Amino acid sequence: MCGIVGYVGSRNCTDVLINGLTKLEYRGYDSAGIAVFSESGNIQVAKSKGRLADLIHKMEREGRPEGHAGIGHTRWATHGEPSDINSHPHTGGRVTIVHNGIIENYKELKEYLSAKGVTFASDTDTEVVARLLDYNYNGSPIETISNTIRDLEGSYALGIIFADHPDVVYATRKESPLIVGLGKEESFIASDVPAILRYTRDYYLLEQEEIAVLDHSGVKVYDAYGVEVQKERKTADWDMDAAEKGGYAHFMLKEIHEQPTAIKTTITPRIRDGLPNLEECNITPEALKQYHRIFVVACGTAMHAGVVGQYVIEKLARIPVTVDIASEFRYRDPILSAEDLVIIISQSGETADSLAAMRLAKNRGAKTLAIVNAKGSSIAREADMLIYTHAGPEIAVASTKAYMVQIAVMYLLAFEFALAAGTIDETECRKLVAELQQTPDYISEILKNKEQTQFIASSLITADSLLYIGRGLDYALSMEGSLKLKEISYIHSESYAAGELKHGTISLISDGMPVIAVATQKALFEKTISNIKEVKARGAKVVLVCRDTYQPDADVADLKFGLPDFDDLLMPMLAVVPLQLIAYYTSVLRGNDVDKPRNLAKSVTVE
């Protein structure tokens, strides 16, 4: 949530800031702004409510800041409504800042400063930080930042410039992510790697309360007490092309089509002699035997990947698995022990609730395993064990390929757990692994049938509300399909276990209401068909996602998407693809901004 970019170098700073902020649009925002040192050393600020295009148009009308050092920001409103005044950057006297996070004690700090005669122009917690920095300023930016952050409670990533230190950018963080990009005679700060890929792949990870100083001589980093520290240079394994659309109309469509490659890249290094091998992740069969319970903790789409994992691990390994929403897990006072494994799933590795849940689990003695896509992220660094998914950058807010590789990893874990528990033998495991390796080819074939998903989408665009139903693994899929549709089409959608319809939900069915039924599980197929007939008889317009071999009668479905025959257990990896495409094309046909849906952020870094 929110995006921060900063630059010091010889390039046109405004161009660099706008380009970087464009690469961070996926994080979600409702306003944008930049602050740039002019050639004479003055700070020029331009900011606007709305999209980056609105900011660009405003600069064209009112004047474009020019210079070689500055900071930029895309804001997601948390304190104060979206407006020009509340947009970042915020200036307090001699200090101008951009901020990602939430300052929990901003009201107390504001009251303290107000009592000292300080006045405020906005409703934001960010301006409070700017005014506090100015109030504390003693001529030494590093000392002032160090003294000020000790008074801040909550989370923050800050880009800071001081009026009397032209062409120098300062940065610090606590909980909220921030990196320092290292170019040739230029340097950057950014909330995420894609913002700097056009210029460099090298960067530092800024640790908690460290202070970075960027000037024309390079970068220096200090700890919270002003002592210089040596940093390890890291190199991103993504290139600029990975963060571009590559000829697709939207990032989401590109990322849906990248799923076969992402699966191969993620699972191939973890398979040896036809069996799962997670030793590189410090996961061995011997270690897995010690766990008597598993908790999967995540948010949104990642949580849905955990539900698939729950079904598969319990079925194969016979180990009890509980799936928790991270924000609920933290506050329900979970009972944990050293015999429990807590699996944290997060694409960004910075999801605030998931990070806090993991820390809680560690404090209570449980072992933690992180499944993340972003290298060097907070969750990745703090987990006891770690599996990286190799999806590459996922720019669209609605997750697709990250979900796919998350469930691929959950399958590998399930196979490894089952082998360790002795509930399957190596022959059966090799068969399952071989089928998992076949999924990319099957998905590639499914992606060729876009016309059917477009046709289905055209039947949904006027709907006000719809339901997704399924049983077992199909119910897990219906949860993800429903979320995808509501995220980007803005159609109200809910998922329900098909067997629960008669317990209240069926009262919602009205004539012409769309119901998307997922029925891929052979063992549950007839029962699901019975549930489908019940909603069809009450006027529902049914879209059936099932195996291609089944030909539904008129009393079962109006439309069908057929899937190849495949192992029940692995069917989610195939069946989710048409659900993704249906959501995508529905959104496109409704004229929505698919990659940047309203009110949503890609990485939720505040609670």
PLM-predicted stretches and their roles:
Residues 1-245, 249, 261-292, 331, ...:
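Conserved short alpha-helical segments that host acidic/polar catalytic motifs at enzyme active sites
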Residues 125-128, 305, 309, 405-410, ...:
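Catalytic-loop motifs flanking and including active-site residues across diverse enzymes
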Residues 226, 541, 554-556, 566-607:
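Generic C-terminus detector
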Residues 259-263, 267-295, 385-514, 587-607:
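Active-site phosphate/pyrophosphate-binding segments
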Residues 289-431, 435-438, 518-561, 582:
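Glycine-rich phosphate-binding loops that contact phosphosugars or nucleotide phosphates
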